[in-house]
Amino acid sequence: MAPIAVGDVVPDGTISFFDENDQLQTASVHSLAAGKKVILFGVPGAFTPTCSMKHVPGFIEKAEELKSKGVDEIICFSVNDPFVMKAWGKTYPENKHVKFVADGSGEYTHLLGLELDLKDKGLGVRSRRFALLLDDLKVTVANVESGGEFTVSSADDILKAL
């Protein structure tokens, strides 16, 4: 499957997360993003070094600035289960705006065409690192990394595109 690209409508799919009342929710991506400007950024795995020390903190630190430029939602996405994503989110007590969501089986990652095969590292099939800017479900920015790199998908990269 070809990777998601600028001009595409983001596919619909199901993701899971814990809401503000600590209740497990399952929702469609379209229900979360329709009619909104949304950043959907993906990471290969919760608690992994680059994701935990660079990618996620950048979006947390820049969240207010992103929102001031019209972003309604900032969603962190990973092929992990929702319990892992909840625990990972709690390691950022300063976070007020980034929602941590799970693609437990990797099905949505497949729909995006953004799988990263990390079986040789014992991690299975994960998501490539990426940052998408969606405007009412349409991809307006698609910053997708090669392999496990972190060169084009930061919060600063999205800010430059806004």
UniProtKB/Swiss-Prot annotation:
Its EC number is 1.11.1.25. It comes from the Eukaryota. One of its GO terms (biological process) is cellular response to oxidative stress. Keywords: Antioxidant, Cytoplasm, Oxidoreductase, Peroxidase, Redox-active center. Induction: Slightly induced by salt stress. Its main location: cytoplasm. Expressed in all tissues but mostly in reproductive tissues such as buds, flowers, siliques and seeds. The active site is at C51 (cysteine sulfenic acid (-soh) intermediate). GO terms for cellular component: chloroplast; cytosol; nucleus; plasma membrane. One of its GO terms (molecular function) is thioredoxin peroxidase activity. It catalyses: [glutaredoxin]-dithiol + a hydroperoxide = [glutaredoxin]-disulfide + an alcohol + H2O. It is found in: Cytoplasm. Residues 4-162 form the Thioredoxin domain. InterPro entries: PRX5-like, Redoxin, Thioredoxin-like_sf, Thioredoxin_domain. The active site is a conserved redox-active cysteine residue, the peroxidatic cysteine (C(P)), which makes the nucleophilic attack on the peroxide substrate. The peroxide oxidizes the C(P)-SH to cysteine sulfenic acid (C(P)-SOH), which then reacts with another cysteine residue, the resolving cysteine (C(R)), to form a disulfide bridge. The disulfide is subsequently reduced by an appropriate electron donor to complete the catalytic cycle. In this 1-Cys peroxiredoxin, no C(R) is present and C(P) instead forms a disulfide with a cysteine from another protein or with a small thiol molecule. Monomer. Reduces hydrogen peroxide and alkyl hydroperoxides with reducing equivalents provided through the thioredoxin or glutaredoxin system. May be involved in intracellular redox signaling. Thiol-specific peroxidase that catalyzes the reduction of hydrogen peroxide and organic hydroperoxides to water and alcohols, respectively. Plays a role in cell protection against oxidative stress by detoxifying peroxides and as sensor of hydrogen peroxide-mediated signaling events. Belongs to the peroxiredoxin family. Prx5 subfamily. This is Peroxiredoxin-2B.
